[in-house]
């Protein structure tokens, strides 16, 4: 019921737990939910009390279903004398707040600040509280915030001064990743969200021809046939989709059908920091797996993650 009604997954009849594809998909979800519970750090009653009132009853039922898995995870950590990532941060905060460690650092530098969570922000606050001379230097870009699913809270970046005090802001407004034609499309898309910081984005290179084209997804094979005629062997073709299960079936025979092409497939999330000569994005349609994302979060994410921004 949880998977079919709330998550809207298609679950095969019979012994669905033997379905390997479903096992992999469910395993990643269970791992995420346990991680969110660990990041919260509180007792079960505290988690339930902190959930929005309109979902509290359902969340209470779901978290009770997850309780044995969380208990097993804690037991495994104890048996191996190990600590997970959330546990490390919680322990560090407690040690700092109890004065068992005095921070000697005057300068704290944080990269990828847009991916910071309230838990990690609390660690920064505890470090700064230990030393009144400490300064915080952060590099982040709210336009690249992609980790809310693991607890990142974008307002810690967009409202930086409210959270960490007054300071100087410096905009790095030149991108070296793409030409101006792609930049124009990216700018229009990102700035439709009023929650994003307004800032200029200038490309180092100016595009002299059309850089973005929309095609029907049925034309993917024909497009690769065309690219096979003029793409150089060293040029990379990167095909992206929202989820792994959206990988085009024709790529199974890519090595024999398009032997001259260097084709890679990745999820959009995993492609951050990558580059390619040609990028093809599939799955740009409405629906449960499409764009924009429908409300597909489970009650666990809705209760334990920061609010959607």
Residue ranges of each PLM-predicted region?
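A basic/glycine-biased coupling hinge at the interface between accessory DNA-binding modules
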Residues: 1-83, 103
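Conserved helicase NTPase motor core
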Residues: 55-156, 174, 273
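Conserved helicase C-terminal RecA-like lobe
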Residues: 107, 233, 274-309
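Conserved RecA-like helicase ATPase core segment
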Residues: 118-209, 307-309
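Short beta-strand/turn micro-motifs composed of small residues
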Residues: 140, 241, 283
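Short acidic low-complexity segments
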Residues: 266-270
